[in-house]
Design a protein with these regions (language model features):
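Positively charged n-region of N-terminal signal peptides that target proteins for export
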Residues: 1-4
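Sequence context of c-type cytochrome heme-c attachment sites
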Residues: 19-128, 132, 138-163, 182-212
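A contiguous, mid-protein "functional segment" used to position or interact
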Residues: 162-184
Length: 212
């Protein structure tokens, strides 16, 4: 989804090769609050935003998890001295920034623990830096938007929506990442996969920003 929120990595189009090191705020994700809304996956967003979903699927953010698999993103791995044959999908420090909702309710389950059957089925749906990586877990605000065509941003925030700002991007795109390249957020946000057009809704299930 090339939206105003496209994924956690929105501040930097990364070739997706290597382990982006999560900041303290990202690592805190493995300790969710009891009332924290669940992640529902980008396919849920697709129901109303199918054009944006199709656009997002073509981005490197969508393929971020694939880049962690053996013999992927070889040029970048070579550049930063990462083992080209290693499976980085088993490294929590890498996975946290290459999936959606790592360790959070409804998100990608934690690496290194035994997964339940439900988590095994859920994990593939949360691979890659998806819509909710930048927009927040959609369990509550997604249905609210469908039922309330006139809504305010503040209402969505109370339901778990997140503004895709520089701080959000830098939770993963920071100097703890072996592939990090300094960037100007203001310049980057308007280019390529980080472009922030208004969302367009493809049928009568919703309207952009409460508009008609």
């Amino acid at each position: 989804m090339r939206w105003l929120l496209i994924t956690t990595g929105m501040a930097l189009t990364f070739s997706g090769a290597a382990a982006l090191r999560p900041s303290a705020s990202t690592e805190a994700a493995v300790c969710p609050r009891a009332d924290e809304p669940k992640y529902v996956g980008s396919k849920t967003c697709q129901k109303c935003h199918f054009k944006e979903y199709g656009s997002w699927q073509k981005t490197k953010m969508a393929q971020a998890f694939t880049s962690l698999k053996p013999n992927q993103a070889l040029e970048v791995r070579k550049k930063v001295n990462l083992d080209p044959a290693k499976d980085y999908t088993k490294e929590a420090a890498c996975v946290a920034c290459h999936v959606t909702g790592y360790g959070k309710p409804g998100g990608y389950p934690e690496v290194g623990k035994e997964w339940t059957e439900e988590e095994k089925l859920r994990a593939p749906l949360m691979e890659g830096v998806g819509c909710e990586s930048c927009h927040g877990p959609g369990e509550k605000y997604s249905p609210y938007k469908k039922d309330n065509k006139e809504y305010k941003w503040a209402e969505l925030v109370k339901l778990g929506a997140v503004h895709a700002d520089e701080k959000n991007c830098k939770s993963c795109h920071n100097d703890k990442s072996p592939t990090f390249v300094p960037f100007n957020f203001t310049e980057k946000i308007g280019k390529d996969t980080h472009e922030v057009p208004k969302l367009k809704f493809n049928h009568d299930c919703d309207h952009p920003h409460g508009g008609k």
